[in-house]
Amino acid sequence: MKFLLLFMTLVFAAPSSAADKILFVLTSHNKMGSLDMKTGFWLGELTHPYYVLADAGFRVDVASIDGGMAPIDPKSLDFSDENNARFINDKKLMASIINTKAIEDVNSEDYQAVVYAGGHGTMWDFSNNELINKLTVSIYERGGIVSAICHGPAALTDVKLSNGQYLVKGRKLAAFTNEEESNVGLTEVVPFSLQDTLMSKGAKHIYGAAWTVNVVNDRRVITGQNPQSARKVGKEILTELKGIK
């Protein structure tokens, strides 16, 4: 009898399968438009929030648009950054990037939060992506968290909720700015202006000075303006997840 009571206590006290799982989604695109230049995801926009969340005990999976090895933007390989340096010796995370899940194979019900890491590659394969749209809506409408960093909000440009409205409509968010795109000389290279496109869908674009930390949390949509904002995004997700749990 005591064994039965203990068993039932453990079963009913166990959290749901999604309660402590977070999904990071990376780009699979590695070419910078018409330029002879490689791109991909920005390493720090994965490592900074990843370690905040993993160190807090959350289970983290990594997916990409096509699956397999996700391309890292060569310009983001700064190993003087402590989180990037940690990544070099992190066999688990390294393996996750080498062999990402394809987004079509992801079960959205497994996750309490999704994080769209940035990098210029996202401008080619995150926007107008039906698989991303379905994943985002599923997690958000179950009460989960949607997050995106820098160019990662390209994933949010076409997401419509079940009521037919854009997720970003009337919502405050941060994203890579036109000024920052101009600073890196890629305004005419990227396929669209992220800032202008989000605003055209009704988003209230909240921006800080170029290359400074700026994170916005509006009703479980957590966004960061640039690579400098990545760690704070992780902390904001952590705070929000603790509130949900």
What are these model-predicted stretches?
Residues 13-15:
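N-terminal signal peptide c-region/cleavage motif recognized by signal peptidases
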Residues 150:
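Catalytic, metal-anchored helix/loop core of enzyme active sites in primary metabolism
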